[in-house]
Regions:
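The catalytic "switch" region of P-loop NTPases
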Residues: 1-22, 275, 281-384
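Walker A/P-loop-proximal flanking segment of P-loop NTPase domains
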Residues: 1-78, 85, 89-91, 148, ...
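Conserved nucleotide-binding/hydrolysis micro-motifs of P-loop NTPases
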Residues: 12, 91, 139-143, 269-270, ...
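P-loop NTPase motor core
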Residues: 70-75, 82-207, 327, 331-345
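Extended, well-ordered alpha-helical scaffold/bundle regions in very large, multi-domain proteins
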Residues: 171-174, 294-315, 484, 500-533
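Long, low-complexity, polar/charged, intrinsically disordered or flexibly structured peripheral segments
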Residues: 195-246
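Conserved Walker B catalytic segment
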Residues: 240-294
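C-terminal helical "lid" subdomain and adjoining coupling/linker elements of P-loop NTPases
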Residues: 278, 358-359, 369-484, 495-506, ...
């Protein structure tokens, strides 16, 4: 039996390791819902969320007007984006199809959650009419918007969802005014007659069709063409962009449609950074949406930092009062590293019934050897432990429990030290995919094999700054270093800035072990020789 044969699901399947907020096609949605692992930690977060949100679906929602914010935090790769994306499917009760079968999002959770009362709360929430708008704020913002960026993105995604012009808010405002007067359909009909094209198709090029717009407005409203032309010419100047107006427009839409609305904003913490004015805008938008919309409009954001850490530096530096935003985002969900390891085990590393006794036999024969082989030296600051039981060995093999902690630190350090390109810096690479890539590399090998740490380098290589990856590639190909030397160089690069693990000789030996029965004395000699080159 080789490593490829021990897993319940194929190692080479598409697991959507890269979660993109706006990739919501049926095929992706089905896989994400079907394979989503509700760990103990995630079930706790879901309970906390629905305890907060369910009252907003009933007559007591007005009492929620000051508590309509949810702040989801966690380190890079912890699953924040995946969590709110799954929430978006669930709260909109998204219908997905796969091979002729149709299911609603809620049905996937009936198999994942055993608590009937908790399921009843979820069921109540998902069957309340709700409009969910999920977006990555950085991908939707214009670089020139600066302090108004957050408000403009909120307005942009709202206009887009309700059918108005997304890219030009003053055009959307014209559409909204015509709709209020009951003249929007007449305007679109007149425009189509005049131009032989639809308004929705042409409105982003309104600069080139101002005469046609004026004529269509005249026919729809009954005013003169000259008055209509003046209206068109003044649209941009007269557009009232402020937070209060935005919230009023949301309220009017909610009143008309009898729904709740959720703005789910991915990576808001990274987008705001240390910009005090942006944080104040987010605070005001959340506060006004809560009050004006009476608990029917919610804001759910993700951030690598928890809310106290995100605003702490700003308050001390600029003397601003962010106490309101702390109150508005009263529901705070922090994803941890334990959640990541459990997700990887359940999505990637579940073993077949035939593999479990085979691995149990390996542990019974080699357990003591594994404990000694995979221990780090006393300089190690974190509790980076090897396997402690047969069950843990079976659950994690061919990986070691400390792989999760160290790889998390590697991802964080590469980002913060500037070695990563834009995609990795924006959270476009997950630990799940890194573990899948490493497992695939050793899949033909037997059950005496382990994953040496350098195997994780392949998962991030293409996302490094070209100068960094080129240096490592050239060093490996210069004729002086052999394959073992090159692999050790990759290990040294990966742990260079990892503070919980020093690159001592003994630690490098432990990280380089690729067989259970590796001769550690001989491996130490090879590592030492390689370091001296």
């Amino acid at each position: 039996m080789n490593i490829e044969q021990i897993f319940e699901k194929r190692l080479d399947r598409n697991i959507n390791g890269v979660v993109k907020a706006e990739q919501t096609d049926d095929a992706s949605a089905w896989i994400e819902l079907d394979e989503y692992v509700i760990t103990r930690e995630l079930e706790g977060h879901l309970r906390h969320f629905f305890e907060s949100y369910v009252p907003a679906t009933g007559p007591d929602r007005i009492r929620m007007e000051n508590k309509i914010g949810v702040w989801v935090s966690g380190f890079f790769g912890s699953g924040k984006s995946h969590f709110i994306k799954i929430l978006s499917y669930l709260l909109s009760n998204r219908k997905v199809s796969h091979n002729g079968t149709e299911r609603h999002a809620y049905s996937f959770f009936e198999d994942k959650i055993k608590d009937a009362l908790f399921l009843a709360d979820i069921n109540k929430a998902v069957h309340h009419p709700t409009e969910v708008i999920l977006f990555n704020i950085d991908s939707r913002a214009n670089v020139d918007d600066k302090e108004d960026a957050i408000l403009k993105v909120f307005l942009k995604v709202f206009n887009e969802r309700v059918g108005y012009c997304a890219d030009f808010p003053h055009i959307a405002h014209l559409e909204r005014e015509l709709a209020k007067r009951g003249q929007y359909d007449a305007f679109k009909t007149a425009f189509a007659t005049i131009t032989d094209s639809s308004w929705e198709k042409e409105r982003d090029s309104y600069y080139f069709i101002s005469d046609e717009m004026a004529e269509a407005l005249s026919q729809a409203t009954g005013q003169s063409v000259d008055a209509s032309r003046q209206w068109v010419e003044q649209l941009d100047k007269n557009f009232p962009l402020d937070i209060n107006n935005f919230c009023q427009w949301v309220k009017e839409w909610l009143d008309e449609n009898g729904k709740n609305i959720l703005f789910m904003v991915d990576e808001v913490g990274q987008f705001i950074g240390k910009n005090t004015q942006m944080m104040l805008k987010l605070q005001t938008i959340t506060e006004n949406l809560g009050v004006i919309c009476g608990g029917r409009a919610w804001v759910i954001v993700t951030s690598q930092a928890d809310i106290n850490a995100a605003i702490g530096g700003m308050s001390s530096r600029d003397g601003q009062d962010f106490s309101k935003i702390q109150g508005r985002f009263s529901t705070r969900l922090q994803l941890s590293s334990s959640n990541t390891s459990e997700v990887i085990q359940k999505r990637l590393l579940v073993k077949t019934d035939a593999a479990k006794p085979a691995l149990a036999k390996v542990w019974q024969e080699k357990g003591d050897i594994l404990r000694n082989q995979l221990a780090f030296d006393p300089t190690t600051t974190a509790s980076l432990r090897p396997y402690t039981s047969e069950e843990e060995f079976i659950d994690n093999y061919p990986f070691v429990p400390w792989h999760y902690q160290i790889l998390q630190k590697v991802f964080e350090s590469i980002r913060t030290k500037g070695a990563a390109g834009k995609q990795l810096a924006m959270g476009e690479r997950s630990q799940l995919e890194a573990f899948q890539t490493a497992a695939q590399q050793i899949s033909p090998q037997g059950l005496d094999s382990l994953v040496p740490f350098w195997r994780f380098y392949a998962a991030i290589e293409s996302f490094l700054e070209p100068a960094v990856s080129r240096t490592i590639t050239q060093a490996c190909q210069n004729g002086i270093l052999d394959e073992f030397d090159g692999n050790l160089l990759k290990t040294l690069f990966l742990i260079r800035y990892v503070d919980v693990l020093k690159s001592t000789l003994d630690n490098l030996v432990t990280l380089s072990i690729d067989k259970i029965d590796t001769d550690k004395v001989e491996l130490r000699r090879r590592v030492e020789k390689s370091l001296n080159k």
